[in-house]
Amino acid sequence: MGLHLSANRGEAARAWALVAAQFAILVALLVWSPAPDFRPPRWLQRAADYAGVAGALWLVLGLVSLGRSATALPLPVAHGRLRTGGLYRLSRHPIYTGLLALGWSWAVGAAAYGSLALAAALTALLWAKARFEEAALARTYPGYVDYAERTPRFLPLGFRLRRSFPRLPGAGRG
């Protein structure tokens, strides 16, 4: 983990708040064990199990791809470079995608409404964290906006529901 590019105090505080919230939700998902509220259909449980395994693999490969540039903070590191190959050709945020798959897999396995609510909270938080990080990446790397327009944020699906990366003021093509 390396030093981050200079960020103003407000931006750094928001970055740390996002990391703290992510950590709190993940810990809550892992340690809270409410009584089951429902019994998921077998097919859903099996799909969730496969998604969890795939998510763990996706997360690890994303971390390995970043190497020394890996950081929990949604800010570019000083020695980093824009990664657009490998897993990052399929998804702009493979680590977040892996966390989402693991979180939802865990929540379905717990079969509790509270766990599903935590997975939904993790989804909303990682969406916000990705948007925050993308703004910083667009300011740092001239080619980021073009990369973001052709690469899905999370899921490497063959279709796009809508343009997922709005043009940022001052973020030119590179």
Go through each PLM region and give its residues.
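Membrane-anchoring alpha-helices and their flanking helix-loop junctions
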Residues: 1-84, 98-174
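Histidine-centered phosphotransfer motif of kinases
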Residues: 85, 89-97
